[in-house]
Amino acid sequence: MKPSIYGLTRDELIAWAIDNGQKAFRATQIWDWLYRKRIQSFDEMTNISKEFLAILKDSFCINPLKQRVAQESADGTVKYLFELPDGMLIETVLMRQHYGQSVCVTTQVGCNIGCTFCASGLIKKQRDLNSGEITAQIMMVQNYFDQRGQDERVSHVVVMGIGEPFDNYQNVMTFLRTINDDHGLAIGARHITVSTSGLAHKIREFANEGVQVNLAVSLHAPNNELRSSIMRINRSFPLDKLFSAIEYYIETTNRRVTFEYIMLNKVNDGVEQAQELADLTKRIRKLSYVNLIPYNPVSEHDQYSRSPKERVAAFYDILKKNGVNCVVRQEHGTDIDAACGQLRSNTMKKDRQKAAAART
């Protein structure tokens, strides 16, 4: 399968064009066709010579994704299941916010982080997505708007879908540069958030990139014993290593870090844990923020359930009394396969059942 041209940054596309005997402005024209006019076929590039179009077609495809499923929620959230060229499945989510249209992208096929409450890890990591496959998710959603004549654009991006973004670091960084490019989609860096489960060395590397992209850390527990029991990654990067990296990030960038905290009933949502969390984040209070997330139950993880509103409220109150900036996250798509990885997992089950039925 040819690589997607979406996998190149503008500078890389210019270098490729020059290597193929073209002037730099040809690459700029191609970039404009891809991201401003958002064409679906190289043949639509009317100011590119037939000879160079032939080279383009021989070298690249445009969009490598095929839509398998689109579930639309009553609140306007759309959950997509896309098929990759090798038949693997990934999820992408469009969330309609009051401040714009936000898209959550996937960075890996499956996940090896091993969080015990998460649907994404039900299927182990098969491979990384390349940068073109990540960018194509944004283009698929933008095409959804364009084809309906909707004067809307993808304005915000969260890299929080299936997989650990920092375990696919270079492809994610290429993706970020592509969607942020002022000559293309021009999605503002401060409108982009990358979430990590806590790869401390990559947080340090990200701090040194000099980008204005937001960082979120999936914390979910305020002490090592509890965090290691629900997030295997904590055994490799315990809280002292993680917070050392976070403090380095804050000192280097002077940017705020968001902590994501899924509320699991009678697991991590007690008043003791709330106080521990307040104490844990005390040193970085001015540049940190806690996002309390209602849990979307997963049938394969039936040992967990959603925290009742009263426990969430008590947890929230303790954080606020300790001066912690925090919010309970607004839910989206609760009437569809809402948990990350759930649509993919359910579709794969159905595919297996159909295949088994066909053999009998």
Swiss-Prot record:
Disulfide bonds join 104-340. Binds 1 [4Fe-4S] cluster. The cluster is coordinated with 3 cysteines and an exchangeable S-adenosyl-L-methionine. Residues 97-335 form the Radical SAM core domain. SUPFAM superfamilies: Radical SAM enzymes. Its EC number is 2.1.1.192. GO terms for cellular component: cytoplasm. One of its GO terms (molecular function) is 4 iron, 4 sulfur cluster binding. Keywords: 4Fe-4S, Cytoplasm, Disulfide bond, Iron, Iron-sulfur, Metal-binding, Methyltransferase, rRNA processing, S-adenosyl-L-methionine, Transferase, tRNA processing. Its main location: cytoplasm. Signal peptide: none annotated. GO terms for biological process: rRNA base methylation; tRNA methylation. InterPro entries: Aldolase_TIM, Methyltransferase_A, RlmN_N, RNA_MTrfase_RlmN, rRNA_lsu_MTrfase_RlmN/Cfr, rSAM. It is found in: Cytoplasm. [4Fe-4S] cluster binds at residues 111, 115, 118. HAMAP family: RNA_methyltr_RlmN. NCBIfam families: rRNA_mod_RlmN. This is Probable dual-specificity RNA methyltransferase RlmN. The gene is rlmN.
